[in-house]
């Protein structure tokens, strides 16, 4: 039996020859044909292929790529770190605030506006509950309201109730992308009640229609209300010029409402709560900052005296067909303004019916030439400087040439032989020019002296009330006075003032020569109920007490003497000191003198002054225009009412009755 050989290991054969002849010349093993590898196109390492130059193989280095990737990653990391620092450190508070804003919702709790009362606590301006009528315009789309013309239908229903134009409401309701619109602000509870009842009717009809298989259209479902307050003036137009008014936002826009807006407005509060998905999170708690109500303002005004003054001036302005008029009543001892009335006026409850020209306070904002009521300042200067006494003789010719002007009195007369007291009683322009000419050795010196007294009396300076739009008057420097002004300013032409300044002049004389700045506010009452008096007004002595008393006696002659121009201001039982005025009026439209300013100023009782009353009427066109004739009766009417209201005792003595004239040769 033949011996068995062990299995052979398979060993790769030699490389194949390059050609067929070579392959044929080699023997092959019998057991297995030899398989030879085909030559590679690339030469083995260390060998160079035939016909080719030897070129080394270069492999790409990974280092630049790694560096580029590392740099990019580093920059990304730096950006992340910078952003992290910005969010966590630099702008942490800002992002926290944004997060809190998204997390929490807050709404404002409006502070209750303070009241304005008269000196007795009677409300002149107060706030009552009201509603802002709002809407969600999206709820008026055909999809939500189930009505194709919901905005038009709703506007037609709401317009008569709100008193607005239906077209305007339609426009507000036809904004489907908006979720909030204000249809009307500060409507009374009665208005909202009407709308609410109407909503109930439509909601009931919609429910029945839907139950019957209909669309259930409801064109008022998107109407809502927001509680607020509304400013009201219980006495209508009484003292409207003083009080002013508020705008549509409830902010003071005129008068004391504007001047004292900060005190009246208070501080709004806030309520903040957490929300999620637009819904309140009850477990997150609520942060509430309560609103602080505004302070109540107590005025110096007496409502009853204000009513009497306003009625008197309104009646006379209408009777005289005048442009306007004012009456001021002032406490001579304290400077407190008891009344400040304007005609025509306005009702701050309904500004839509008000004349724009009447919205201010003409008694403080009008500036005009006062005329003869200003002569009292000239007489004060003459007496205080000691250049004349009430009995000094003044010969008053029919005409007087000064500079390039020829001056005359209001009435034609022969030569008058008057005392200085008579010059004031008969309101002689010529006599006043002659008297004030004695104030200096030259006319320039006299001008300087007179100017200083006019300034002391407050001409050309604010009254001290700080009222919005108040005028300071016009008084040029004495070196700037024209030739004409040197002689017209002493009798009240060529300078300008407002009604409050005019009243203050007479209060200064009545108060013994001491000027007290007028006041309109007695004090404030805060949210704690404590009353804080207003600061005491500034005081300044203008003339001596002796001069003031002498002037008061001279002013009595204007009213009491049969030759005086103010006899219509007499009040039985009371001694009255006063002065008439009839000035040429500067027409702001025509730019020259046209028409007259009639006025009367005075105080009572003359022996113990308590009350000052000033009246002026601009451009009376019907009937008389002299101050003593049309303003004297108003003075009497208002002064009598004020004396009785304040329970002022009658005079206990007779007037001195200083001589008015003299006989030549005396």
Please annotate each region the language model reported.
Residues 1-41:
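N-terminal targeting leaders characterized by basic, low-complexity, disordered sequences
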Residues 2-5, 42-43, 60-94:
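Hydrophobic alpha-helical transmembrane signal-anchor segments
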Residues 3, 153-160, 171-293, 615:
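Small/polar-residue-rich segments within soluble enzyme cores
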Residues 531-536, 632-666:
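Short, gly/Ser/Thr-rich active-site loops of penicillin-recognizing serine hydrolases
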């Amino acid at each position: 039996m033949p011996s068995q050989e062990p299995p052979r290991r398979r060993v790769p054969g030699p490389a194949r020859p390059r050609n067929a002849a070579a392959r044929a010349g080699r023997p092959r093993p019998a057991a297995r044909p030899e398989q030879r590898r085909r030559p590679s196109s690339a030469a083995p390492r260390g060998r160079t292929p035939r016909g080719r130059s030897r070129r080394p193989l270069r492999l790409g280095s990974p280092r630049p790529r790694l560096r580029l990737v590392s740099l990019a990653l580093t920059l990304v990391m730096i950006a992340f770190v910078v952003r992290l620092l910005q969010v966590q450190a630099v702008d942490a508070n800002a992002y926290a605030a944004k997060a809190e804003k998204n997390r929490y919702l807050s709404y404002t709790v409006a502070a209750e506006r303070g009241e304005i009362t008269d000196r007795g606590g009677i409300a002149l301006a107060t706030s009552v509950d009201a509603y802002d009528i709002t809407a969600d315009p999206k709820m008026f789309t055909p999809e939500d309201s189930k009505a194709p013309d919901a905005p038009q239908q709703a506007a037609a229903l709401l317009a008569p109730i709100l008193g607005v134009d239906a077209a305007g409401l339609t426009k507000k309701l036809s904004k489907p992308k908006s979720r909030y619109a204000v249809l009307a602000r500060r409507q009374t509870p009665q208005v909202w009640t009407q709308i609410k009842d109407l909503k109930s009717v439509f909601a009931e009809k919609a429910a029945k229609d839907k139950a019957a298989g209909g669309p259930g259209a409801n064109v008022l479902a998107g109407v809502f209300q927001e509680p607020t307050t509304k400013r009201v003036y219980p006495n209508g137009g009484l003292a409207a010029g003083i009080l002013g008014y508020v705008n549509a936002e409830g902010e003071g826009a005129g008068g004391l409402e504007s001047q004292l807006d900060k005190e009246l407005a208070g501080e709004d509060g806030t309520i903040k709560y957490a929300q999620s998905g637009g819904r309140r999170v009850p477990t997150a708690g609520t942060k509430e900052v309560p609103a602080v109500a505004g302070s109540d303002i107590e005025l110096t005004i007496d409502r009853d005296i204000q009513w009497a003054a306003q009625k008197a001036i309104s009646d006379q302005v209408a009777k005289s067909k005048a442009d306007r008029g004012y009456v001021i009543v002032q406490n001579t001892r304290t400077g407190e303004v008891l009344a400040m009335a304007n005609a025509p006026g306005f009702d701050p409850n309904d500004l839509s019916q008000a004349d724009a020209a009447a919205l201010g306070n003409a008694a403080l904002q009008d500036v005009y030439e006062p005329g003869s009521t200003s002569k009292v300042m000239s007489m004060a200067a003459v007496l205080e400087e000691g250049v004349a006494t009430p009995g000094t003789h003044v010969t008053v010719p029919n005409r007087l040439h000064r500079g390039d002007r020829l001056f005359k009195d209001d009435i034609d007369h022969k030569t008058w032989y008057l005392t200085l007291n008579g010059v004031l009683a008969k309101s002689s322009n010529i006599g006043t020019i002659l008297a004030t000419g004695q104030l200096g050795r030259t006319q320039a010196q006299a001008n300087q002296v007179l100017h200083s007294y006019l300034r002391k009396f407050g001409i050309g300076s604010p009254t001290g009330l700080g009222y919005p739009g108040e005028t300071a008057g016009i008084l040029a420097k004495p070196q700037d006075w024209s030739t004409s002004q040197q002689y017209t300013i002493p009798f009240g032409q060529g300078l300008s003032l407002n009604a409050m300044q005019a009243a203050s002049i007479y209060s200064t004389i009545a108060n013994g020569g001491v000027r007290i700045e007028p006041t309109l506010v007695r004090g404030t009452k805060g949210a704690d109920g404590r009353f804080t008096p207003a600061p005491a007004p500034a005081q300044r002595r203008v003339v001596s007490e002796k001069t003031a008393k002498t002037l008061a006696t001279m002013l009595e002659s204007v009213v009491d003497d049969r030759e005086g121009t103010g006899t219509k201001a007499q009040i039985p039982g009371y001694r009255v000191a006063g002065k008439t005025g009839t000035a040429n009026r500067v027409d702001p439209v025509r730019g020259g003198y046209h028409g007259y300013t009639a006025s009367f100023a005075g105080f009572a009782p003359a022996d113990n002054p308590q009350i000052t009353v000033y009246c002026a009427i601009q451009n009376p066109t019907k009937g008389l225009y002299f101050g003593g004739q049309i303003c004297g009766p108003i003075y009497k009417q208002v002064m009598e009412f004020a004396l009785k209201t304040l329970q002022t005792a009658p005079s206990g003595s007779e007037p001195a009755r200083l001589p008015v004239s003299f006989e030549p040769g005396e």
